[in-house]
């Protein structure tokens, strides 16, 4: 007992020290215009490096030397990070103007949302009071029979404290329909590996310290807070053990189990899902997709075996952590101490104006970006992107016609699917209507909760209705692109259609190396190990023959071996982490898409130049068009990252920049020819891998 008390005392001393993490004054930094991002930056090239030995160092070396990771970022890239910085500033200009002098009801709505977030004096004045009703409702819970009612009430108010994930999604076997889906969830950390892996042992210790501090801020006594924190970690660890791992969960076919509601309730009879579904206004449905049945069996055992006090601690924790950034500075600092410093490796939090810009975009994305898109993405840019995508699709079609591992039946099905892909470029045809969302300039927590209720209501309203094929899954300020297998669509938000990815004023080589490779990457997802399970209508129906499926796996095994043998990061004794190798299987889909996207984009460039009477051997600024293509591709992935790459391969199938560049060009012979490499050099190996 004395040893236990000593351990608690030492931990709480650490907690006290952790409640004022350094650097939080950065919240008050004011916006400054970020520098413009060049489409191709020849000054970034490290000419002391050999392109045939380490192309990433050659293309990015000087940029890496001159662009350290900012203290409020976990990593910094020449493309995604720099462009996100620019877009945030442009969005801030819209929000700042709307907050001070709105010119329309829509501008007043998002201007008030932003202003409420920025008013930290009022946040301090209100303290924890906005959460008191929810915390009291949890405190009044007397037994496990009331869990369904409580989590439903919390969800209906905008909180997210469920131990699972409930949503309305497309029916995997009939993509024209939308059905209820329920699956694993309930964890605070980014991935189940954080709870189970030895690599994250120290992170878990810090997690307990963080939760203890948060509970103490909310009024718990020290030992009580520590015990509550341990109980939450144990609970979430049990949920993690019951959850599918990162590789399995990406296999869509394994997570489709249509079940009637009564049979689903039998999986977890101790949690009244009927009360929950009614409480969140889910509407009437007789069947649902139970994606992870075993998870709910385990959840039921936990409900029966854990005391009601443990569940109350779990629910209180999820209410606190979900709203931490809307609470007084002590909570924000503590939230940053763990999720920012420990998990994301940031030294300082984002300035408040950035946090509020991101929060407003998340809540009112279509409202905020309507005016922004008009000023930053012209109709002519959209037309240029339309033409580029059409050229890429033709190149992919030509490749499908000649792939040696693909038989006639599979080839025909692949061409049919390609012809049915829909491209959404820039912005939606119809903007989301936020008229039903009430925004109060003096109620930050209320705005956040009402926004969550609005989003949940919009999602639940889809049940039983035809799918809106023109709906976007992300806001237009998102610097990313994605392929949706259920929609069979490739989507390019306006935010990514800017330099360095896309510039209608620069030579085609750089555009094809930038956005062209990204688009080719997304297109090949329609035909990878998961894309092959969905037909052109988005239905879960395999269109590869059994023999061709076997040949496809044989082709990809080469990439599994190629990437899987490489060291991602050396061990770090100071941070509880051994050497990490790349996981060739976990990253296979993304690696295959990188390789396919590069090849398709290059062929599309070659054909585009030929149609203009030009050649890939023509020179601009001392580099041939094909060299500029590969440089444009590589410089998209120029990045600096501190420590995180060591654990990144465990949780992220997207590899770090050096491998996305070097691992890809090694497999494309045209690269070796472009830079006059000798066969056998690292970037021009004697043997290589090819799927597409």
Segments (PLM) and residue ranges:
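Hydrophobic/aromatic-rich, well-ordered segments within soluble, folded domains that form packed cores
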Residues: 45-65, 194-216, 588, 596-600
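Noncatalytic, helix-rich "gating/capping" subdomain that lines the substrate-entry/channel surface
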Residues: 95-391
């Amino acid at each position: 007992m004395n040893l236990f008390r000593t351990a608690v005392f030492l931990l709480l001393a650490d907690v006290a020290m952790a409640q004022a993490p350094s650097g939080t004054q950065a919240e008050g930094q004011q916006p400054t215009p970020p520098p413009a991002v060049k489409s191709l930056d020849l000054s970034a090239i490290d000419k002391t490096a050999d392109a045939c030995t380490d192309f990433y160092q050659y293309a990015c070396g000087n940029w890496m030397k001159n662009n350290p990771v900012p203290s409020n970022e976990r990593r910094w890239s020449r493309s995604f990070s720099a462009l996100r910085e620019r877009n945030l500033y442009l969005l801030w200009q819209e929000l700042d103007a709307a907050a001070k002098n709105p010119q329309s009801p829509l501008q007043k709505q998002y201007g008030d949302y932003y202003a409420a977030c920025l008013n930290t004096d009022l946040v301090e004045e209100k303290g924890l009071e906005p959460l008191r009703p929810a915390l009291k409702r949890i405190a009044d819970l007397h037994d496990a029979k009331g869990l369904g009612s409580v989590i439903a009430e919390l969800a209906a108010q905008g909180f997210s404290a469920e131990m699972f994930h409930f949503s309305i999604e497309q029916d995997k076997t009939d993509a024209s329909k939308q059905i209820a889906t329920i699956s694993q969830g309930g964890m605070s950390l980014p991935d189940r590996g954080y709870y189970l892996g030895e690599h994250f042992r120290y992170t878990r210790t810090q997690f307990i310290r963080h939760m203890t501090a948060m509970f103490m801020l909310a009024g718990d006594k020290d030992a009580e807070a520590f015990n509550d924190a341990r109980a939450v970690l144990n609970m979430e660890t049990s949920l993690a053990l019951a959850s599918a791992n990162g590789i399995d969960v990406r296999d869509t076919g394994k997570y489709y189990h249509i079940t009637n509601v009564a049979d689903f309730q039998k999986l977890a009879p101790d949690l009244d899902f009927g009360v929950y579904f009614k409480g969140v206004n889910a509407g009437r449905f007789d069947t649902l997709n139970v994606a992870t049945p075993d998870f709910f069996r385990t959840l039921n055992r936990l409900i029966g075996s854990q005391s009601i006090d443990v569940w109350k601690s779990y629910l209180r924790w999820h209410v606190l952590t979900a709203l931490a950034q809307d609470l007084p500075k002590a909570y924000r600092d503590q939230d940053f101490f763990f999720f920012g410093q420990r998990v994301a490796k940031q030294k300082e939090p984002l300035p408040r104006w950035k946090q509020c810009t991101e929060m407003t975009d998340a809540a009112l994305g279509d409202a905020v970006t309507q005016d922004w898109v008009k000023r930053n993405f012209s109709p002519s840019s959209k037309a240029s992107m339309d033409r580029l995508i059409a050229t890429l699709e033709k190149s992919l079609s030509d490749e499908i016609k000649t792939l040696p591992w693909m038989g006639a039946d599979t080839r025909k099905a692949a061409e049919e699917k390609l012809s049915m892909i829909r491209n959404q470029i820039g912005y939606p045809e119809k903007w989301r209507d936020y008229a039903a969302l009430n925004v109060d300039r003096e109620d930050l927590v209320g705005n956040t909760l009402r926004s969550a209720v609005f989003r949940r209501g919009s999602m639940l309203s889809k049940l039983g209705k035809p799918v809106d094929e023109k709906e976007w899954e992300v806001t237009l300020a998102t610097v990313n692109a994605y392929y949706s297998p259920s929609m069979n669509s490739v989507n390019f938000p306006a935010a990514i259609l800017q330099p360095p990815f896309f510039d209608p004023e620069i030579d085609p080589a750089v555009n094809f190396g930038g956005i062209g490779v990204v688009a080719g990457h997304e297109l090949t997802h329609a035909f990878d190990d998961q894309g092959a399970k969905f037909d052109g209508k988005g239905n879960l129906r395999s269109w590869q023959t059994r023999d061709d499926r076997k040949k496809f796996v044989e082709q990809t095994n080469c990439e599994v071996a190629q990437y899987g043998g490489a060291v991602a990061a050396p061990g770090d004794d100071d941070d509880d982490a051994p050497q990490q190798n790349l996981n060739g299987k976990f990253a296979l889909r993304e690696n295959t898409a990188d390789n396919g996207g590069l090849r398709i984009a290059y062929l599309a460039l070659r054909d585009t130049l030929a149609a203009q009477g030009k050649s890939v051997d023509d020179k601009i600024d001392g580099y041939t068009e094909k060299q500029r293509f590969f440089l444009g591709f590589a410089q998209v992935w120029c990045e600096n990252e501190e420590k995180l790459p060591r654990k990144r391969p465990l949780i992220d199938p997207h590899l770090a920049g050096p491998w996305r560049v070097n691992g890809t060009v090694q497999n494309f012979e045209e690269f070796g020819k472009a830079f006059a490499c000798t066969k056998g050099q690292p970037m021009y190996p004697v043997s290589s891998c090819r799927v597409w």
